[in-house]
């Protein structure tokens, strides 16, 4: 196994570069809902990009499942992209979209805690170990390549065990986002009005008017898996796809090419800007100080770009809505920019479709242990239902 991984690593390290240096142009660059005039704000643009957490292949971590691979080189790229999208959601949740990372500067304690959620250890809630093991419940063997929809389902299930970040993760189905279902999942009611610091219960079983604001809102990670063509992206979707990167709720997109995943964070013209996980670095652990050396978790090189028409049509868009007003604003933007198209990229509907099974907000299954440590073996995944993976990535 190790010799095979070494072969992969050598191939990956000499991966041909895409477009890197930004051209001399007056065009705007959009990065995760923020615009940067390229000519006047290039340094600010590069700083914004390097502030994103960058997760790549790693080697020399403890074997997954005790006897599995100790490197994810060659198969873990979509998992790493999923980690990057989720990490951006957590940054927005705790530090805000405008927070910026500065090299070798002391960072907020929330930043370190977020980073430690993704370390390559079985006891970290969003580690490669946890994601790969949870993928078994989605029909993926450990060491098998994941598609965007599978990663979205894995994130949704792992988030149930993450009490600190307390995210509601909604993964759309059949290219349709249902407002009523999201409000049921995210609106929470206090247990006893006299105790504002008390625990909260979801209002999922209550019939409520979704036009009435919630008393409290569980931060929402919204993932929309899409297929934007058969063997290649249909040009009719290009403008709507780009509009999603302009939305202030944007977490970018998961996608790429068959068996080569990238985390897309913005665009310039008709070129997508992405972070590339195809670099193999050595496992980094928590130091004696209790902190993590974060120098290898930020990409300090100029980001890569590719033509949007070269994108494989199987993608997943991500959005983060910290408060209910953010979600309501997102709905308005979708109605204005996405639903106006003759061939819509996805649908946004108010009510749960009558021909669908009833919506049941995801709940943590009953297990004997709690937190990330619960997935010690694939036998413990039987409480989760298998989600149908609709994506059919083109080959060749």
UniProtKB/Swiss-Prot annotation:
Output the Gene Ontology terms for molecular function: cysteine-type peptidase activity; protein-phosphatidylethanolamide deconjugating activity
Reaction catalysed by this chain? Answer: [protein]-C-terminal L-amino acid-glycyl-phosphatidylethanolamide + H2O = [protein]-C-terminal L-amino acid-glycine + a 1,2-diacyl-sn-glycero-3-phosphoethanolamine
Give the positions the UniProt entry annotates as the active site: 77 (nucleophile), 276, 278
| Short motif LIR, span | 390-393
One GO biological process term is: proteolysis
What is stated as this protein's family in its record? Belongs to the peptidase C54 family.
Q: Which first-to-last residue range defines the signal peptide?
A: none
Activity regulation description:
Inhibited by N-ethylmaleimide. Redox-regulated during autophagy since reducing conditions activate ATG4A whereas an oxidizing environment such as the presence of H(2)O(2) inhibits its activity.
InterPro entries in the record: ATG4_LIR, Papain-like_cys_pep_sf, Peptidase_C54, Peptidase_C54_cat
**Originating organism:** Mus musculus (Mouse)
- What gene name is given for the protein in this entry? Atg4a
Q: List the disulfide bonds.
A: none
Keyword Oxidoreductase among record annotations: no
Q: Where in the cell is it found?
A: Cytoplasm
According to the record's subunit comment, the protein's assembly and interactions are: Interacts with ATG9A; the interaction is direct.
**One Pfam family from the UniProt entry?**
Peptidase_C54
User: So what EC number does this one have?
Assistant: 3.4.22.-
Q: Looking at the record's lineage, which domain of life comes first?
A: Eukaryota
Q: What's the entry's take on its domains? A: The LIR motif (LC3-interacting region) is required for the interaction with the ATG8 family proteins. Required for proteolytic activation and delipidation of ATG8 proteins.
Q: Which GO terms describe its cellular component?
A: cytoplasm
Please give the function described in this protein's UniProt entry.
Cysteine protease that plays a key role in autophagy by mediating both proteolytic activation and delipidation of ATG8 family proteins. The protease activity is required for proteolytic activation of ATG8 family proteins: cleaves the C-terminal amino acid of ATG8 proteins to reveal a C-terminal glycine. Exposure of the glycine at the C-terminus is essential for ATG8 proteins conjugation to phosphatidylethanolamine (PE) and insertion to membranes, which is necessary for autophagy. Preferred substrate is GABARAPL2 followed by MAP1LC3A and GABARAP.
**Designated name of the protein:** Cysteine protease ATG4A
UniProt keywords (A-Z) are: Autophagy, Cytoplasm, Hydrolase, Lipid metabolism, Protease, Protein transport, Thiol protease, Transport, Ubl conjugation pathway
């Amino acid at each position: 196994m190790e010799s095979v991984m070494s072969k992969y690593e050598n191939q990956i390290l000499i991966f041909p570069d895409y477009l890197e240096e930004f051209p001399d142009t007056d065009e705007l660059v959009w990065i995760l809902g923020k615009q940067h005039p390229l000519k006047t704000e290039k340094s600010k643009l590069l700083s914004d990009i390097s502030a994103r957490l960058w997760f790549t292949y790693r080697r020399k971590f403890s074997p997954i499942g005790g006897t599995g691979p100790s490197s994810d080189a060659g198969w873990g790229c979509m998992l790493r992209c999923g980690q990057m999208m989720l990490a951006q959601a957590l940054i927005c949740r705790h530090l805000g979209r405008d927070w910026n990372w500065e090299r070798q500067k002391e960072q907020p304690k929330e930043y370190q805690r977020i980073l430690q959620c993704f370390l390559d250890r079985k006891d970290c809630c969003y580690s490669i170990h946890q994601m790969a093991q949870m993928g078994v419940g989605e029909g993926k063997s450990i060491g098998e390549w994941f598609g965007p929809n599978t990663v979205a389902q894995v994130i949704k299930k792992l988030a149930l065990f993450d009490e600190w970040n307390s995210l509601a993760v909604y993964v759309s189905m059949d290219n349709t986002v249902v407002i009523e279902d999201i409000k049921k999942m995210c609106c929470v009611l206090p247990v006893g009005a006299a105790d504002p610091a008390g625990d909260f219960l979801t209002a999922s079983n209550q019939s409520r008017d979704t036009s009435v604001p919630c008393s409290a809102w569980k931060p929402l990670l919204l993932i929309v898996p899409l297929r934007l063509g058969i063997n290649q992206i249909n040009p009719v979707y290009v403008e709507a796809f780009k509009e999603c990167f302009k939305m202030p709720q944007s977490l970018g997109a998961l996608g790429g090419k068959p068996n080569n995943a990238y985390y897309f964070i913005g665009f310039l013209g008709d070129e997508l800007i992405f972070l590339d996980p195809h670099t193999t670095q050595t496992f980094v652990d928590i130091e004696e100080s209790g902190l993590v050396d974060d120098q290898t978790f930020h990409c300090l090189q100029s980001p890569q770009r590719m033509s949007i028409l070269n994108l494989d049509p199987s993608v997943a868009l991500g959005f983060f809505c910290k408060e209910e007003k953010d979600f309501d604003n997102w709905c308005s933007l979708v109605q204005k920019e996405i639903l106006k198209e003759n061939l819509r990229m996805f649908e946004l509907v108010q009510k749960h479709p009558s021909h669908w099974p009833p919506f049941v907000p995801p709940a943590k299954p009953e297990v004997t242990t709690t937190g990330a440590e619960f997935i010690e073996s694939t036998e413990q995944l039987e409480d989760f239902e298998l989600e149908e993976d609709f994506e059919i990535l083109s080959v060749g």
